[in-house]
Swiss-Prot record:
It comes from the Bacteria. It is found in: Cell membrane. Belongs to the MscS (TC 1.A.23) family. Signal peptide: none annotated. One of its GO terms (cellular component) is plasma membrane. Gene3D superfamilies: 1.10.287.1260, 2.30.30.60, 3.30.70.100. The chain crosses the membrane at residues 22-42, 74-94, 104-124, 144-164, 168-188. InterPro entries: LSM_dom_sf (IPR010920), MS_channel_1st (IPR049142), MS_channel_C (IPR049278), MscS_beta-dom_sf (IPR023408), MscS_channel_2nd (IPR006685), MscS_channel_C_sf (IPR011066), MscS_channel_CS (IPR006686), MscS_channel_TM-2 (IPR011014). The keyword Protein biosynthesis does not apply. One of its GO terms (biological process) is transmembrane transport. This is Uncharacterized MscS family protein aq_812. It comes from Aquifex aeolicus (strain VF5).
Length: 368
């Protein structure tokens, strides 16, 4: 009995102690608030895990994996939100004015939301790169992906920052006006950069050139080595690397040799003036037959073989046809084979190629 009385007296002392106040706050409220904080700190990961498990089961049923990225991006921020919410409840228990507790909750909720969105953008970056790899190559895709990621992140930071300022009663109208003027100044200073970036995106979508193609832009001709966000690199035939701003490619005529399905060949041959009419007619006829039968000559294009004019030292024959290839080496092989056969035709018909010559006639020999 005495032991029970002793325990009751201890309990009375304990209950009396709970009525005590610390900084004007009842001790029992401090204990409850501390318990809430401890509970959320211990169970935040468990709660987040259970919610993520439920959401994951739902996302598996969908065809896209974007929702899986969203869950993956938001799981860690959500666990921190649980702690913030527990702290918010603790503030209410401690009788902190609700207006300040609400501001605390909204402030950290915005920060956590912004963090979660940026985490999602980092994960989604690979998707952006994969999309642009299909149309512009790996290097270009990574550059475009990084650029888009930075723009989106900056947008998120601006929106979250503006929302926080507005939540704390800061007039963002004046700030936006100042930012607008600053943005105008920056945009004017970076006009060329933005123009090149926009042109890079146009090149990506319109595809006037691709890596590996042989092109001519302005006075530069060569193979495209790289298409960047701001410039395109062309390796000329003398192995010089030329960097051309993307806006110059968009604003100028681009001749793409790789996309030609055939190449035109046009030249003149000159035979000597001693060539008889019958010989010349036979030469023209046999060259036409050669071009008609040659496998390297495009059959869907007209060819021309005509005695066109009288030169200073030769009878000039125009020869024009289309080589049925866009490969440069194959193109040269076709030209070489046809040229050798033309040489045989001229020699077979008893004529020869003329070369510039001048005859000097002396009417009277000078007296010695």
């Amino acid at each position: 009995m005495e032991e029970i009385l002793i325990w009751i007296k201890k309990l009375e002392k304990y209950l009396y102690a709970l009525n005590a106040k610390v900084a004007g706050i009842p001790l029992y409220k401090i204990i409850i608030a501390s318990a809430i904080m401890l509970f959320t700190l211990i169970l935040r990961r468990l709660i987040a895990f259970l919610i993520v498990k439920i959401l994951t089961k739902l996302t598996i049923r969908t065809k896209t994996d974007v929702d899986e990225l969203i869950v993956k991006a938001f799981v860690k921020p959500f666990s921190y939100f649980i702690v913030v919410f527990g702290f918010y409840l603790s503030l209410l228990v401690l009788e902190v004015p609700k207006v300040y507790a609400d501001k605390f909750l909204k402030t950290f909720s915005l920060l956590i939301l912004g963090w979660a969105i940026i985490r999602f953008l980092n994960l989604f970056h690979n998707k952006i790169v994969e999309f642009f790899v299909k149309v512009g190559g790996k290097d270009f895709a990574e550059e475009v992906g990084d650029f888009i990621l930075k723009i989106l992140k900056a947008f998120v930071v601006v929106i979250v920052g503006a929302s926080l300022l507005q939540e704390w009663g800061v007039n963002i109208g004046a700030i936006l006006a100042s930012v607008g003027l600053l943005g105008l100044a920056v945009s004017l200073a970076a006009k060329d950069t933005f123009e090149n970036i926009l042109s890079g995106l146009i090149i990506l979508l319109d595809k006037p050139v691709k890596v590996g193609e042989t092109v001519k832009v302005k006075d530069f001709m060569g193979s495209v080595e790289d298409i960047g966000l701001r410039s395109t690199k062309i390796r000329t035939f003398d192995k010089s690397l030329v960097t051309i701003p993307n806006r110059d490619i968009v604003n100028n005529h681009v001749e793409n040799f790789t996309r030609r399905n055939k190449r035109r060949v046009r030249f003149y041959i000159g035979v000597v003036y001693s060539t008889k009419r019958e010989q010349l007619e036979n030469i023209l006829k046999e060259i036409r037959e050669l071009l008609k039968e040659h496998p390297g000559v495009a059959k869907d294009e007209k060819f021309y073989v005509y005695f066109e004019n009288y030169g200073d030292s030769s009878l000039n024959i125009l020869i024009q046809y289309y080589a049925n290839t866009n490969d440069y080496e194959e193109y040269l092989k076709i030209i070489e084979d046809i040229n050798l056969k033309i040489m045989e035709i001229v020699e077979k018909n008893g004529s020869s190629f003329a070369f510039p010559s001048r005859s000097v006639y002396i009417e009277k020999m000078p007296k010695s």
